[in-house]
Amino acid sequence: MAVSSFQCPTIFSSSSISGFQCRSDPDLVGSPVGGSSRRRVHASAGISSSFTGDAGLSSRILRFPPNFVRQLSIKARRNCSNIGVAQIVAAKWSNNPSSALPSAAAAAATSSASAVSSAASAAAASSAAAAPVAAAPPVVLKSVDEEVVVAEEGIREKIGSVQLTDSKHSFLSSDGSLTVHAGERLGRGIVTDAITTPVVNTSAYFFKKTAELIDFKEKRSVSFEYGRYGNPTTVVLEDKISALEGAESTLVMASGMCASTVMLLALVPAGGHIVTTTDCYRKTRIFMENFLPKLGITVTVIDPADIAGLEAAVNEFKVSLFFTESPTNPFLRCVDIELVSKICHKRGTLVCIDGTFATPLNQKALALGADLVVHSATKYIGGHNDVLAGCICGSLKLVSEIRNLHHVLGGTLNPNAAYLIIRGMKTLHLRVQQQNSTAFRMAEILEAHPKVSHVYYPGLPSHPEHELAKRQMTGFGGVVSFEIDGDIETTIKFVDSLKIPYIAPSFGGCESIVDQPAIMSYWDLPQEERLKYGIKDNLVRFSFGVEDFEDVKADILQALEAI
């Protein structure tokens, strides 16, 4: 049967494009995110940002690799994850309008039309009948082994000559569903038919002809080019995180510190000024206090609740960025994100919130007014203590600036690590629910225990920002910090008496983790220096995993009885 009788099914929706939209240049990143109003923070600018180039787009072209149907039937059913490179890398979305197709290609299409099997055409026609859509007949280019399907798409929103649906995840009403399906549910089936996202292990991507390369360089088409600039597996992860944060764009990197440092270097000019808070991750503080001054960048440090101090700083200095955690590490202080964003934006200051302790489920910093959100994806987002990663979420413009520098500095996330995070995120909502619950219940128990002198947890009324946390968070997190009623030796005995948690420097995973910050993070400093940061020898930070609450409770209580 002739190719012209083929009708393209609805799998070519606008939602399907972003999952494997090739993005190697910084201005080709990001896409609109659907969902509730809380998540649609930057949607207006993002819709048109997914497609760039000088020519108007009247169609989209998917290029299948040689013998695609045969490969799919033989390999995909047997081992979808190993199809990866050949089929995904070969799938390129072209910006060339259909009218620009060369006459030679048109002739090739005509000559090869009869080679398409009637069975394939019938199956396609059946799919089209089940889900009708305004479609143009496909065009086959070059040979029977390389099909290029050109399809007009359902009209909901039209920008120029590109037709897009107005809501990418309109059928997903909760963050829990987004953690499972965002970035994956739509679109990938046209490449592998695999439920899970394939891992694309390649360092570079090839162009079949020099003309393709020139089209790419002159932005008439988009494609992956080099592994440091983008990867199909990594793009799926970025889209999933963007959906949760309500961001136009997300950039993933090799670690949380990589994300923080590249963000600071990209957005704060030499001679600029930063405002941060007293309580924060020590390595972040070291970078700001020891390395940024070499670029002439100065830092003002304020208490997380010191709004007057923030106003004084932005009025006195030309502040480029306000950067803090919320909740903070290790005392879980909370910053009024909405208020500080209003104060900073009046003076042209950007706001970046490290939301690692909150997760995108417990707090939507972009919806509260922040310009950027940083996460150590090593923690809750990955959630299994088996991968290092970091991410930056925000507007397309800001993330693109950071991506530009990232392409130069490196720190690229390995696609295997990206896959582990994608898989881990499918249970993020379940894990966080359990961790929120266990942490809250244990915080109440610890606060009432005679051998605990103080508990730091935003879910407790005794916390200085408890009312603020109730306003801007939907859950209080899975980490509780507390002080044992005793000295460092007593605290060590408590920690060593625990049987369930690991003594380790991380948090947010399925396994419970405990540490003494005075030893784990500040042991190189004398006690008087540690006290400047509020780090007492009897301070304990406990990250609750997903173990049964009663087991964890019994373990902590027996350890307290042992001291």
Swiss-Prot record:
Enzyme class: transferase
Catalytic activity from the UniProt record: O-phospho-L-homoserine + L-cysteine = L,L-cystathionine + phosphate; O-succinyl-L-homoserine + L-cysteine = L,L-cystathionine + succinate + H(+)
Result for mutant: R78K: In mto1-7; over-accumulation of soluble methionine
Regulation (activators, inhibitors): Inhibited by propargylglycine.
Gene Ontology cellular-component terms listed: chloroplast; chloroplast stroma
Record has Amino-acid biosynthesis as a keyword: yes
EC number: 2.5.1.160
Gene Ontology terms for molecular function: cystathionine gamma-synthase activity; pyridoxal phosphate binding
Pfam families the record matches: Cys_Met_Meta_PP
Induction line: Down-regulated by methionine.
Cofactors demanded by this protein: pyridoxal 5'-phosphate
Compartments, record wording: Plastid, Chloroplast
InterPro entries listed in its UniProt record: CGS1/2, Cys/Met-Metab_PyrdxlP-dep_enz, Cys_met_metab_PP, PyrdxlP-dep_Trfase, PyrdxlP-dep_Trfase_major, PyrdxlP-dep_Trfase_small
Swiss-Prot/TrEMBL keywords: Amino-acid biosynthesis, Chloroplast, Methionine biosynthesis, Plastid, Pyridoxal phosphate, Transferase, Transit peptide
Effect of G84S: In mto1-1; over-accumulation of soluble methionine
Binding site for pyridoxal 5'-phosphate: Y226, R228, G256, M257, Y281, S376, T378
Claim: Transferase is one of the keywords in the record: yes
pH-dependent activity: Optimum pH is 7.5.
GO biological process, one term: selenium compound metabolic process
Pathway annotation from the record: Amino-acid biosynthesis; L-methionine biosynthesis via de novo pathway; L-cystathionine from O-succinyl-L-homoserine: step 1/1
Transit peptide: 1-68
Other known facts: A DNA region of the first exon coding for a conserved motif of 11 amino acids in CGS1 (positions 77-87) is required for post-transcriptional autoregulation and acts in cis to down-regulate its own mRNA stability in response to excess methionine. This conserved motif is dispensable for CGS enzymatic activity and only found in plant CGSs. It is unclear whether the transit peptide cleavage site is between Phe-68 and Val-69 or Ala-90 and Ala-91.
Family: Belongs to the trans-sulfuration enzymes family.
PANTHER family: CYSTATHIONINE GAMMA-SYNTHASE, CYSTATHIONINE GAMMA-SYNTHASE 1, CHLOROPLASTIC-RELATED
Protein name (record): Cystathionine gamma-synthase 1, chloroplastic
